Amino acid sequence: MTENRGTWCFWPATATIAGPSGGLPSGVALRQCAGNLPRKFEPQAHRTMKQAVIVGVQGVIGRYICDHLLKLGDWEVIGLSRRQPAETRPRLRHVSVDLLDRADAEAKLSGLTGITHIFYCAFQSRPTWAEHNAPNLAMLVNAVEPIANASMVLEHFNLIEGTKYYGSHLGPFKTPAKESDPPHMLPNFYYDQEQWLRTNQPASRWTWSALRPHAICGFALGNPMNLMTCLAVYAAISKELGLPLRFPCKPGTFDAIYQMTDSALLAKGMTWAATTPAAYNQVFNLTNGDFFRWRNVWPRIARAFDMEPGPVQTIKLTEFMTDKAPLWSAMQQKYGLEAHPYEQLVAWPFADYVWAGDWDIMSDMTKIRRAGFHEYVDSEDIILGMLAAFHHQRIIP
């Protein structure tokens, strides 16, 4: 660690963390660097290769499922997104496609004749909840139908939903939420997407599954709707200004029970659901498997930045942090950080939205455990490991 980058108290300076182009950070895995040696690949002749399409491959979910499948070695991967990736990735074929344009989808996807699995991680944001429905359903249909028509070997479609299905974004809801709980008062585009699958799958040769994570913890440059990068940049700027690390949202949020889903854990769950008969045509909650309160983890986060933990001071991050781009640029120069544009790292309205909920967020994991998925991670370790990775990747001082 270079002297002018400040003090980092969580991760040893000798640790080696792969950057985004060479493998993505994943909480607990970051604490097991010695175990992250490349797997010995078996001869291709001894395996049956599966071919996956990842819709939304450049997002915080898509990047991790892509990495996971490629590391397994018996998957070929085709990634879909609207924009060309800023980096090339070995063994990943990319297709740029506008899934809101059916003609473009047909033209780009009708040649994908060997696809066995589709992992759907795409999302189109709109100003109101009602406006989310049409574009997000259209993108799903425009991805599934051309590929299903082209590939006679399509086996499974995996969909990512979330706890907003239960109304976690609206206010207090029944906790712990179970998959059998009804959705909140519509509209909800998760409901529309799932109902389309339930309606159309019985006449198809493929199966489907849907997972409901919460507060996905990962990193994807150019996808600023990520609480971990917002937290990291907020803490780094607070330290640069000589401030304690105050919790910037409601007192109730500080004390409410919360949960997260590590992106690497989610990738494992997606692969399990796509290849396990017990998961076919089923919906599962998938979180880290534990719960926490921000009040309890906040001192550990402050220590990681060598800062004093401050009290709650409720502010709108959108109002107080948007003007910090010049300061961040100066910090990048001062500490030799990667020159990622401020607006590509953080979306303060998203952080305000996530931290606005001063009610418990809890999902029941019984169903997925009974079906055979038993992976779990420690959420506090995930948070601290992700922040350490940002430091070693020179994203923050």
Model regions and ranges:
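N-terminal Rossmann NAD(P)H-binding glycine-rich loop of SDR-like oxidoreductase domains
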Residues: 52-72
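NAD(P)H-binding glycine-rich loop region in Rossmannoid oxidoreductase-like domains
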Residues: 85-88, 93-142
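Active-site Tyr-X1-5-Lys
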Residues: 183-211
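Glycine/proline-rich active-site loop of Rossmann-fold NAD(P)-dependent oxidoreductases
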Residues: 204, 216-234, 264, 272-284, ...
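Mid/C-terminal beta-alpha module of Rossmann-like enzyme folds, strongest
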Residues: 266-351, 364-366, 370, 387-394
